[in-house]
Amino acid sequence: MKVVLLQDVKGLGKKDSIVEVNDGYARNYLIPRKLAAPLTEGLEKHIKEKKEAEQKKKEKELMLAKDLADKLEKSQVIIKAKAGENGKLFGSITNKEIADEIKRQLGIDMDKKKIELEDPIKQIGSYEVSIRLYQGIVAKLKVHVTSS
């Protein structure tokens, strides 16, 4: 019997996948527990449409991420911070401050978790910061730290 999984089932498949199972397993276990539904033409068509819509959404997100990456690659962010005479900052600049400055200077809402800093910035100078925008898309943003 072919069924559509309504939830992830360990050892069988993920949600919305169509699987072939024994009739008894489907009728006595999967269907009563709302883990699966019998496959009908309407349900199969609905799942196909849902997968196509999901694919289009992923493609759109990918295009937006590529556009954003191009914009960030061409941009730079200038951060002013208090520093001592030798160029050492009082405190440090973390990915949260960089995200705030991207929002303020470029008007782009950026999640601080997407900004990759090995260590917080503690010196005046120019840095290249990696920003993970999407799976496989990483933008390099130039960050200039100056003393205020």
Curated annotation (Swiss-Prot):
Give TM regions. none
GO MF: rRNA binding; structural constituent of ribosome
Q: Kindly give the Gene3D superfamilies that the UniProt entry links to this protein.
A: Ribosomal protein L9, C-terminal domain, Ribosomal protein L9, N-terminal domain
Record's GO cellular component terms: ribonucleoprotein complex; ribosome
Source domain of life is Bacteria
**GO biological process assignments:** translation
* Cross-referenced InterPro entries: Ribosomal_bL9, Ribosomal_bL9/RNase_H1_N, Ribosomal_bL9_bac/chp, Ribosomal_bL9_C, Ribosomal_bL9_C_sf, Ribosomal_bL9_N, Ribosomal_bL9_N_sf
Keywords, comma-separated and alphabetical = Ribonucleoprotein, Ribosomal protein, RNA-binding, rRNA-binding
Q: Which Pfam families match?
A: Ribosomal_L9_C, Ribosomal_L9_N
Signal sequence region: none
Q: Which family does it belong to?
A: Belongs to the bacterial ribosomal protein bL9 family.
PANTHER family, A to Z: 50S RIBOSOMAL PROTEIN L9
Q: Tell me the function of this protein.
A: Binds to the 23S rRNA.
What protein name applies here?
Large ribosomal subunit protein bL9
The organism of origin for this protein:
Caldicellulosiruptor saccharolyticus (strain ATCC 43494 / DSM 8903 / Tp8T 6331)
Tell me what gene encodes this.
rplI
